[in-house]
Every structure is written in structure tokens, then in C-alpha cells.
Amino acid sequence: MFVYTTIMLLLLAEINHSQGCSGLCKINESPQTNIDYRICGDQITQKYTELCGNPAAGRRNRITGLDQRSIFESNLLAKRFLISRRQIVNNRRTDIVEECCAEGCKAEEVKEYCI
């Protein structure tokens, strides 16, 4: 019985491998799809910056000559932005770490997280 089970598992593994992609694959999706890379930790930050740019670059000392009213309006805009971002994040089923580190990802999937 053990030999039969082992042979069946090997055949199933070969069928799954031959149906899908070559190289790195997402195994949690049906059908299996190719991935560009599997990255974790600082590599995710580096790839995000490479594909999305640095969102903090060039923003320093950008706001000058503000009066009290424009500061208040900026505060409201910031709160609206944070609320909208929170809703987007809460609606996502996965985050970038799960997507790229655990499953592997494509460049297009990283770009979905760009602000």
C-alpha cells in the first residue's frame, strides 16, 4: 500500500508540474502562474522603491507661506486620505509581504501597492 501511495503522489506531483509554469510558480493559485521573484524583508522595500519611486523624495520644504486656514484644510485632506487608504488596505485579502515573500510575485503585483 505504501508503494502504491508513493507512486500516486509522485504522479500527481508530475502532473501538477507539467500543467503549469516553468521556473518559479505561485502554487496557491489555479492555474499556477509564473512569478518574477520571491523577495522578503529589505528586498521588498528595495523593489517597491525601484518600481514605484520614493514617495518621500522631494517633499521636504515644499510647503511655505501657510496661513492658519490652509493648515486646517491640509489637516482635513490628510485625514480623508488616511481614511481612504485604510479602506483600501482593509479590503485587500493579502499584503505585499504575503504576496511576495510567501507566494512570490510579479512586478505588476508590486505596482498595485504604489501610492
From Swiss-Prot:
One matching Pfam family: Insulin
Propeptide positions: 59-93
Keywords, comma-separated and alphabetical: Disulfide bond, Ion channel impairing toxin, Secreted, Signal, Toxin
GO cellular component: extracellular region
Tissues of expression: Expressed in tentacles.
PROSITE patterns: INSULIN
InterPro entries in the cross-refs: Insulin-like (IPR016179), Insulin-like_sf (IPR036438), Insulin-rel_pep (IPR016724), Insulin_CS (IPR022353), Insulin_family (IPR022352)
SUPFAM superfamilies noted in UniProt: Insulin-like
Disulfide pairings: 40-101, 52-114, 100-105
Cell compartment(s), UniProt: Secreted
Signal peptide boundaries: 1-20
One Gene Ontology MF term: hormone activity
Ranges annotated as spanning the membrane: none
Family of the protein in this entry: Belongs to the insulin family.
Domain notes: The truncated synthetic analog (dimer of 27-58 and 94-115) does not display the characteristic helical content of insulin and is largely disorded.
Function: Heterodimer with unknown function. Surprisingly, the truncated synthetic analog (dimer of 27-58 and 94-115) does not bind to long insulin receptor (HIR-B) and insulin-like growth factor 1 receptor. This truncated synthetic analog shows very weak inhibitory activity on different voltage-gated channels.
Other noteworthy facts: Negative results: the truncated synthetic analog (dimer of 27-58 and 94-115) does not bind to insulin receptor subunit B (INSR, HIR-B) and insulin-like growth factor 1 receptor (IGF1R). The truncated synthetic analog shows very weak inhibitory activity against mammalian potassium, sodium, and calcium voltage-gated channels (rKv1.2/KCNA2, hKv1.3/KCNA3, rKv2.1/KCNB1, hKv3.1/KCNC1, rKv4.2/KCND2, hKv7.2/hKv7.3 (KCNQ2/KCNQ3), hKv10.1/KCNH1/EAG1, hKv11.1/KCNH2/ERG1 and Shaker IR, rNav1.2/SCN2A, rNav1.3/SCN3A, rNav1.4/SCN4A, hNav1.5/SCN5A, rNav1.6/SCN8A, hNav1.7/SCN9A, BgNaV, hCav3.1/CACNA1G).
Name recorded for this polypeptide: Insulin-like peptide IlO1_i1
Organism whose genome encodes this protein: Oulactis sp.
